[in-house]
Amino acid sequence: MDPNREPEPCRPQDWGKFEITNRDGAARIGKFHTRHGVVTTPMLLPVVNPNLRTIEPREMWDKYGIQALITNSYVIWKHENLKDSALADGVHKLIDYPGVIMTDSGTFQSYVYGDVEVGVEEIVQFQKDIGVDIATMLDVFSRPDMTYSQVERAVDETLERAPISIETAGGVMLNGPIQGGLFPKLRAKSAVGMSALDFSVHPIGGIVPIMEQQKYRDLAKIMLASKSNLSPNRPVHM
C-alpha cells in the first residue's frame, strides 16, 4: 500500500450518495460517497479508542487499506485535551487518519454507565464542529431485558429526538439508529419512522449485548424486522 496515498474527495453534490452495484436478495454490494472518498460496502469499520490505540489509525490506512473507521465523539468531548485538539485541528488530525471517520454519540456509554452528560443537540453540533464524515444522533439504548412498554418509550423518544438532530447536523451525514430491543414489532416501528427522515445511514442499535450473549436467533429476527422496513437506498450498519 502506498504510504503517501490520500483519499480522493467526492463532489459535494454526491456526499451521502449510495450506489448499489450488485445485489442478491437483501444482500447488497455498493459504493458510498463521502467527503473523504468513496467506500465500498459491505466493509468492516474498526473501532478506535482515541485514548488507547492498539493499532495506530495511520497504520490501518497505510498498511491494511482500511477505508473507514469509527471513533467515539463522546469520549473526545468528555476529555478536555482531546476536545480542544479536535476543535482546533479536526478529528482526522487528532487521530492521524485520512480516510472516512464515523463517530458514535455516547449512546453505548449510557448503556454501560447509566447516563451521559451531553445534550442531544450539543453532541451532534460537536461532531459537526470537529469535521466527522458521518455523525450519529444521541438515541435511546434499548436493553434486551427491558419490557415492551419500556422499549416502546425508548423508540418513541429516539424518534422525537431525530428531527432536531438532523437540523443541527446541517450538511453533515447523520446516522439514524434503529432501536426496538428484542421486539420485531418495535424494530419495524423504529425502522419505518427513521427511514422517513433524512438520514444517510441506519445502524441497527442495541445489538452488542445480544451478540455478547450469543443470541443469534434473536439477532436474525431483529435484522429481518429492521431491514425489511428500511429504505433500500441507504447503507445499514451493525
Language-model features: locations:
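Non-catalytic, usually N-terminal nucleic-acid engagement modules in DNA/RNA processing proteins
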Residues: 1-169
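Glycine-rich phosphate/ribose-binding loops and adjacent secondary-structure elements
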Residues: 2-3, 168-238
